[in-house]
């Protein structure tokens, strides 16, 4: 039905170029997921439009149908491809993509934000902001229990109240209850944001933090974008690739052996790394400023490819 609505609408017909971008969407974690996204590219070509996969994160592709959809649509209907990491390029190649694939960077790090006054302005303690989500809750319950229990134990280590703890759900509908449960079971005093925030407000909150601890990729990228030292909990190659390309020296590994290595989350390791970043906050912020400026240059590749397509 949605596809028919799109055909009847003028969105594609009135456009000159159709860009499909974002991270994690082009993967067959759901059987029909590649088809559900790429069908719009086919539709765009039927209307004679130029098409581009813009700074995407791709893979994994584990089903024959998923690989077929990617191979068929990209080889026949895509004009330009930029990907944000080597791993994404490799997944496309393994699926049989023959088109040129250009490695660039994640455009989120180029986000600018206007400084705004928030209720969080006046702080007397160092602020640690957590961006957490219930990863693997449905797909791997035992690994999810490790994640939940490890995070509860980790948060309990801040019971001395020396730090201000702030929990920032990125997808409120999915993440809020998980964050609330972590706070309630750990018994600590913490603030929990309970509204969907726009990117500008989110970046202001991250900028006013002393360290960001994030499970979500874009929690890490947005922290880097506003110059706040961060501790990524890496559960997917997309986050690992970003950290590697940025040149950041901190990460905590956690995974089930599919999208990332098979490793339980260690609360003591998480706490020790958080404390180290806080102790080195000023030096790390200066280093991060240099690293993010270099990484931002990768976004120029995306724009250069787009300009070439526009010609």
Q: Where do the language-model regions lie?
A:
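Active-site anion-handling motifs in enzyme catalytic cores
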Residues: 1-311
């Amino acid at each position: 039905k949605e596809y028919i609505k799109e055909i009847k609408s003028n969105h594609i017909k009135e456009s000159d170029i159709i860009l499909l971008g974002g991270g994690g969407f082009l993967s067959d974690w759901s059987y029909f997921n590649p088809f559900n996204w790429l069908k719009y590219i086919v539709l765009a070509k039927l209307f004679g439009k130029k098409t581009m996969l813009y700074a995407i994160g791709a893979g994994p592709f584990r089903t024959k149908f998923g690989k077929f959809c990617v191979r068929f649509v990209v080889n026949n209907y895509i004009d330009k491809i930029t990907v944000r990491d080597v791993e994404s390029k490799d997944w496309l190649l393994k699926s049989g993509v023959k088109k040129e694939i250009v490695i660039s960077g994640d455009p989120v790090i180029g986000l600018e934000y206007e400084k705004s006054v928030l209720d969080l302005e006046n702080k007397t303690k160092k602020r640690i902001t957590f961006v957490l989500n219930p990863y693997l809750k449905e797909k791997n319950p035992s690994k999810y229990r490790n994640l939940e229990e490890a995070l509860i134990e980790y948060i309990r280590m801040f019971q001395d109240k020396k730090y201000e703890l702030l929990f920032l759900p990125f997808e409120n509908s999915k993440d809020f209850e998980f964050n609330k449960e972590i706070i309630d079971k750990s018994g600590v005093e913490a603030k929990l944001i309970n509204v969907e925030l726009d990117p500008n407000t989110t970046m202001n909150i991250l900028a006013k933090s002393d360290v960001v601890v994030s499970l979500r990729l874009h929690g890490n990228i947005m922290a880097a974008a506003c110059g706040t030292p961060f501790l990524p909990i890496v559960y997917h190659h997309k986050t690992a690739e970003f950290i590697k390309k940025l040149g950041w020296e901190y990460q905590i590994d956690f995974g089930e052996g599919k999208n990332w290595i098979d490793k339980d989350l260690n609360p003591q390791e998480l706490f020790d790394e958080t404390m180290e970043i806080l102790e080195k906050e000023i030096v790390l912020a200066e280093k991060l400023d240099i690293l993010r400026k270099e990484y931002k240059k990768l976004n120029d590749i995306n724009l250069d490819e787009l300009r070439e397509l526009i010609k």
